[in-house]
Amino acid sequence: MSDFVDRVTVHVKGGDGGNGSAGIRREKYKPLAGPNGGNGGKGGSVILKADQNATSLLDFRFMPHRTADSGTMGLGDTKDGSNGADLVLPVPVGTVVFEARGAQGFPKKPGAVLADLRHAGDTYVAAAGGAGGLGNAALANRTRRAPGFALLGEPGDERDIILELKSIADVALVGFPSAGKSSLIAAMSAAKPKIADYPFTTLVPNLGVVQAGDMRYTIADVPGLIPGASQGKGLGLTFLRHIERTEIIAHVIDCVTIDPDRDPLSDYYALEKELGEYADDLDLPLGAIPIPERPRVIILNKIDVPDAKELADFVRPEFEKLDLPVYEISTASHAGLKELNFALAKLVKEMRAQIAEREESVDEERVVIKPLEEPGTQRRNGRNAQVREFEIEREDDGHGNFWFTVTGVKPERWVRQTNFDNDEAVGYLADRLAKLGVEDSLRKHGAHAGDEVRIGRGERAVAFDWDPTIAAGAEMLDGTQLGSRGKDLRLEEEDGRKRRRTNSERRREYHEMMDARAAVRAAMQAERAAGHWADPSIDDDRHDEQSLFGRGEVEEYEDEPGADGSRQLD
């Protein structure tokens, strides 16, 4: 099995964020001294990093599932959980990251380009780690002094990606099988490719570093091409993509072929046809030179063989008519290699200067279009990118069942952070959604109490029956020590500063109290003057009888008054 692998499908998952803690600080004489739950740690991310020492994607074939570490849970005493370590995966320089498309259980196909790691040190976050949940200490405020809940950590990103290696070399050696490409790269560099006297000996690209004085450049030995390679014949498109990154294409032509249908000119035109057909379907990055317009070099090989020199001298004028530089070499005797080496180095130097100028001009000419701000959107992190808070869509299954789907960064994140086993946390979620305007928007879309509402899509969607009058937090709990959500009445009693009165308030309360007493005394004097009260100096129950007279509740009494002038009841 070859050690060279240039395309793999990898399943990456970021670490989950740690859950927040819902702790209460307990001290002597203060059994409930306030919340002290810490925040959960952030999950680690899966990061791809271009490394010059990496030459293949072989490691990903045997280990296609990569997961970063998760963050730990927060603790009491406001101790935050530790963050999960990032998982940094080295990939060869020239690796392109694609979005994997396809049904579950079937081979994935490349989709949109996510990243192009063309330079050493380039990084790409393939799967971001989840954020840690907030503890109840971070959730406390003036109105929610003792939250009885904490937020859950968010799960890390999870998806499939396709890694595709496109070799980055200054010069690409192309030619028919057994043209001597591997022998040439072995003669010009320290590379040691497999060399044999049969076709398709080279099955994987070989890279070699060539030194020409103080100039250093790289050459790539692309496996042999044949007519129809652009349609999949021979090795097909398997290695044609390695030519995309090379700025110079060198045709290595065999001058001693024994095939009667082949000659140096026909070999050149046949390979150019395949390169042109492959380039038609190629989507090059902005500013890149199309493959048909890149510089060509003709290398006539094996001139040390009898009659090969005569054939090379015969076809040389034909190539020169096409304005193509021609070099006659022998990889066996090393004839002409020095001249070829310095000629390629000079051409590479010129192309590098053109590439630098082209990249600068592309950056200067790039047009940035800034969209107008729309109602219901907001800026993220002060940048021009706008983010719509949420979207609501009414959906149905065609059988009379319908529901409302709420999508948006904030609502979906809040749902993932909510512990639905905690009623107070559910009430907190309801308040956040109402404050964001979700409830008002649901009413505008025709939602009624009891309708099904789904927040998010896919496996992480949460469905529930909408109740716009849902009680909040602590009000849903059966506890005599709980006030409004997030409050504990025992903590309210310990706050003496809240009952402290100002001097003006004290004077006002004193005057109100004295006025109330004076009013009571005046009322008592009026009742006594009206005869509703008996003489308090006599110890009997006549004041009770007199009070009954005042209310008109006596129906019968004696005609003759008593010795003290009072009436006696029957």
Swiss-Prot record:
InterPro entries per UniProt: G_OBG, GTP-bd, GTP-bd_Obg/CgtA, GTP-bd_prot_GTP1/OBG_C_sf, GTP1-OBG_CS, GTP1_OBG_dom, GTP1_OBG_dom_sf, OBG_GTPase
EC number: 3.6.5.-
Name this polypeptide is given: GTPase Obg
HAMAP family in the cross-refs: GTPase_Obg
Pfam families membership: DUF1967 (PF09269), GTP1_OBG (PF01018), MMR_HSR1 (PF01926)
Keywords assigned: Cytoplasm, GTP-binding, Hydrolase, Magnesium, Metal-binding, Nucleotide-binding
Gene Ontology biological process: ribosome biogenesis
Domain Obg: 2-168
Compartments, as annotated in UniProt: Cytoplasm
Enzyme class: hydrolase
GO cellular component, one term: cytoplasm
Gene name, Swiss-Prot/TrEMBL: obg
Positions bound to GTP: 175-182, 200-204, 221-224, 301-304, 330-332
Cofactor(s), by name: Mg(2+)
